[in-house]
Swiss-Prot record:
Protein name, as recorded: (R)-mandelonitrile lyase 4
Residues where FAD binds: 64-65, 83-84, 134, 138-141, 245, 487-488, 516, 527-528
Organism of origin: Prunus serotina
Main subcellular localisation: other
Role according to the record: Involved in cyanogenesis, the release of HCN from injured tissues. Catalyzes the stereospecific addition of HCN to a variety of aldehydes in vitro. It is a major seed constituent, and could have the additional role of a storage form for reduced nitrogen.
Keywords from the UniProt entry: Disulfide bond, FAD, Flavoprotein, Glycoprotein, Lyase, Signal, Vacuole
Encoding gene (name): MDL4
Enzyme kind, highest EC tier: lyase
Alphabetical list of InterPro entries matching this protein: FAD/NAD-bd_sf, GMC_Oxidoreductase-Related, GMC_OxRdtase, GMC_OxRdtase_N, GMC_OxRtase_C
Positions bound to substrate: 357, 486
Compartment(s): Vacuole, Aleurone grain
Transmembrane intervals: none
Pfam family, one: GMC_oxred_N
Active site, renumbered: 488 (proton donor), 526 (proton acceptor)
Length: 574
């Protein structure tokens, strides 16, 4: 065979492999079941932990990436996970599909799973405070990132391993949603509005209309990253809840600046130390707000800024807390003349300029915090549909700063600078114009209160779309005036600025970051699938790297006292 022909064959085979990786839906969790709390046998309240302990890996944050990362590493090494929140059995409403709105409605008492904050843009927002992270409080939408994200990420991915990591997650906690009336109508309207092609059911982020995966099963039970802890080795894995990590401990001995442990406090305010043994590491998985905050409090960040706060500079890192972005969420609420059934987001409309979806809801007396931009937004007195457009990327970047220079429990300040980049504003305008086309479809006619053409005839809750679909200035004003958070904020410790392509903090040994702070753009319309995969992926890469070096595997067995509340939770779970 000629060389050119052989090269062509190889190219075709490689493209086929990539196509299979990104287009085929592999096995999902296929039966509804209770949330699996088997892992509680190795979960402890931090008050019951030793004042000083040693572990191969210390993971700060038991959230979307932290849980799969911990489970993976525990197959070979001793692992401690430090989570500032508590467990889901303390808040059973987190475990149902109805809990999404309910948990946003609960007042923040300093312990609830949803921590409220208002960005310096003046927009309401939330972060998680529970084992399982945002996978315990979100809307359950599951998608894989697309090929272009990997190509532009600054990381040399092993795409076979990426695919295996996705499957590892999906087999445990991802479901194909059942048919929901409003979601079916949403899909029909997207297609009628020109969001093509019809991709049927699939998980990969790609242009067109599709039914995507969900972490809610068809009985309405939530499944989340905490359940992935069940895949870990219980003899090697310890999870401490209500453990607030205060700072990273560093050493400057002959090997250079090295992370050697962390200091954390329990709910009684007692200080503990967890130290790294052997060639282990500290891995930060505390999220977009928590990870940059902890780096700054530990003396890793912009030198002049740290000095101004009287924080001793351990390592000058000018980009810690920079490139913090949040995807704008703009929307229209319609109040149909007849009740519609509540539904979670399962149908997506994807284009290169915007991502769209919709949910339907019962009315409520207490507003779900951050569903609308501010608490002064009008409340629905009947069932309603919330039709959403998301700006990809985004290119508009903000920053994170400390509100307290000594107390990790005081949330940092963050400003996202929504739509400050003109490209983002253009994408928002395009998206909201497409929602105008969506509202004008035949599929949406039964949801009008008056039989009027185009976008007219709907009972709109809040700000309506501009009447003139060609008035870009009016749409730009709409985008600025109605912006809300999509809860998909990211960045602050990004690849190429703070960490390298192996997720190691540059200039510091034994310190990595594996969470949503690592990339300056959202990896898909809904990012939880990517970050679940990322925990498994990086954990597997670490095990492979250490195994290839011929290191002996270190294991240890933990037998501290179970806290009383977890004993009762165990009896509840089983």
């Amino acid at each position: 065979m000629e060389k050119s022909t052989m090269s062509a064959v190889v190219l075709v085979l490689n493209l086929l492999v990539l196509h299979l990786q990104y287009s085929e839906v592999h096995s999902l969790a296929n039966t509804s079941s209770e949330h699996d709390f088997g892992y509680l046998k190795f979960v402890y309240n931090a008050v019951d932990l030793e004042l000083e302990g040693s572990y191969d890996y210390i993971i700060v944050g038991g959230g979307t990436s932290g849980c799969p990362l911990a489970a993976t590493l525990s197959a070979n090494y001793s692992v401690l996970v430090l989570e500032r929140g508590t467990i889901a059995t303390e808040y059973p409403n987190t475990l149902t599909v109805d809990g999404f709105a309910y948990n946003l409605q609960q007042q923040d008492d300093g312990k609830t799973p949803v921590e409220r904050f208002v960005s310096e843009d003046g927009i309401d927002n939330v972060r998680s405070r529970i084992l399982g992270g945002t996978t315990i409080i979100n809307a359950g939408v599951y998608a894989r990132a697309n090929e272009s994200f990997y190509n532009n990420s600054g990381v040399e991915w092993d795409l076979d391993l990426v695919n295996e990591a996705y499957e590892w997650v999906e087999d445990a906690i991802v479901y194909k949603p059942s048919n929901q009336s409003w979601q079916s109508i949403t899909g029909t309207a997207f297609l009628e509005a020109g969001v093509h092609p019809d991709n049927g059911f699939g998980l990969v982020h790609e242009e067109g209309t599709r039914l995507t995966g969900s972490t809610f099963d068809n009985s309405g039970t939530r499944h989340a990253s905490d359940e992935l802890l069940n895949k870990g080795d219980p003899d090697n894995l310890k999870v401490a809840v209500e453990a607030a990590v205060q700072k990273i401990i560093f050493s400057t001995e002959s090997s250079g600046l090295t992370a050697v442990g962390v200091v954390y406090t329990d709910s009684n305010g007692t200080s503990h130390r967890a130290l790294v043994s052997g060639k282990g590491e500290v891995i930060l998985s505390a999220g977009t707000l928590g990870t940059p905050q902890l780096l700054l409090l530990s003396g890793v960040g912009p030198e002049s800024y740290l000095t101004s706060l009287n924080i001793s500079v351990v390592a000058s890192h000018p980009y810690v807390g920079q490139y913090v972005n949040d995807n704008p969420r703009n929307f229209i609420n319609i109040l149909p003349p007849n009740p519609i059934e509540p539904s979670t987001v399962t149908v997506l409309g994807i284009t290169s300029d915007f991502y769209q979806c919709s949910l339907s809801s019962l009315p409520f007396d207490t507003p779900p915090f951050s569903l609308f931009p501010t608490t002064s937004y009008p409340l629905p007195n009947q069932t309603f549909a919330h039709i959403v457009s998301k700006v990809p990327g985004p290119l508009s970047a903000g920053s994170l700063t400390l509100q307290s220079s000594s107390n990790v429990s005081v949330a940092p300040n963050v400003k996202f600078n929504y739509c400050s980049d003109p490209v983002d504003l253009t994408h928002c305008v395009s998206g909201m114009k497409k929602i105008g086309v969506f509202l004008s479809t035949d599929a949406l006619k039964p949801y009008k209160v008056d039989d009027l053409p185009g976008i007219d005839g709907f009972n709109i809750l809040g700000t309506p779309l501009p009447e003139n679909q060609t008035d870009d200035a009016a749409f730009e004003k709409f985008c600025r005036d109605t912006v809300a958070s999509y809860w998909h904020y990211h960045g602050g410790a990004i690849v190429g600025k703070v960490i390298d392509g192996n997720f190691r903090v540059t200039g510091i040994n034994a310190l990595r970051v594996v969470d949503g702070s690592t990339f300056p753009a959202t990896p898909a319309s809904h990012p939880q699938g990517f970050y679940l995969m990322l925990g498994r992926y990086v954990g597997t890469k670490i095990v492979q790297e250490r195994s290839a070096s011929g290191e002996a595997i270190h294991t240890s067995t933990f037998k501290p006292k179970l806290m009383d509340s977890l004993k009762s939770a165990l009896s509840f779970a089983f």
